[in-house]
């Protein structure tokens, strides 16, 4: 499998996705447009690039931690999933989580980061029950959403 990612620059006025530092897992994605996000509002923002994720891999679009902590800018469907067959422009659903202050995103601002990872493409097999399929019970069982505790004050 190649260690490269094919990128089409759809907007020649923007830089290609890039790593801020050597060894960073993600590459920064840039906004291709000016956007004003009022408090609590979201917008689908173009990045000006398309990528060809290799088969057996997935692209995951994550928020930039600095934007989330400093101004409350995040991604609605975090992480966003880019399947290997998608060839269109990458777009990011940004949301302003600040309760009072609008966020201004300028063309060329770094708005998200793209990570590309291997993914297991498992075959789905229908079973009537996990017991009948020979899948052992676990200590967790069907306990979800808060089943492990840890927040006595909430």
From Swiss-Prot:
Tagged with keyword Metal-binding: yes
Substrates-to-products reaction catalysed: dUTP + H2O = dUMP + diphosphate + H(+)
GO molecular function (one): dUTP diphosphatase activity
Entry keyword annotation includes Metal-binding: yes
GO biological process: dUMP biosynthetic process; dUTP catabolic process
Other comment: Each trimer binds three substrate molecules. The ligands are bound between subunits, and for each substrate molecule, residues from adjacent subunits contribute to the binding interactions.
Enzyme class: hydrolase
Binding positions for substrate per the UniProt entry: 64-66, 77, 81-83, 91
Cofactor requirement: Mg(2+)
Membrane-crossing residue ranges in chain numbering: none
HAMAP family the record matches: dUTPase_bact
The protein, known as: Deoxyuridine 5'-triphosphate nucleotidohydrolase
Entry similarity comment: Belongs to the dUTPase family.
Assembly description: Homotrimer.
Assigned keywords, A-Z: Hydrolase, Magnesium, Metal-binding, Nucleotide metabolism
Biological or metabolic pathway of the protein: Pyrimidine metabolism; dUMP biosynthesis; dUMP from dCTP (dUTP route): step 2/2
Function: This enzyme is involved in nucleotide metabolism: it produces dUMP, the immediate precursor of thymidine nucleotides and it decreases the intracellular concentration of dUTP so that uracil cannot be incorporated into DNA.
Documented EC number(s): 3.6.1.23
Organism superkingdom: Bacteria
């Amino acid at each position: 499998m190649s260690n490269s990612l094919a990128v089409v620059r759809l907007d020649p006025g923007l830089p290609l996705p890039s790593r801020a530092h050597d060894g960073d897992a993600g590459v920064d994605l840039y906004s291709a447009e000016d956007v004003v996000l009022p408090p609590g509002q979201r917008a689908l923002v173009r990045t000006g690039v398309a990528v060809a994720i290799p088969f057996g891999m997935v692209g995951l679009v994550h928020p930039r931690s600095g934007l989330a902590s400093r101004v409350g800018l995040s991604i609605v469907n975090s992480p966003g999933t880019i399947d290997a067959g998608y060839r269109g422009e990458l777009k990011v659903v940004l949301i302003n989580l600040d309760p009072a202050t609008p966020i201004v995103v300028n063309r060329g601002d770094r708005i998200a980061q793209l990570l590309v990872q291997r993914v297991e493409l498992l075959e789905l097999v229908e079973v009537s029950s996990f017991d009948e399929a020979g899948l052992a019970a676990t200590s967790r069982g069907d306990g979800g959403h808060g089943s492990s505790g840890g927040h006595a004050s909430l």
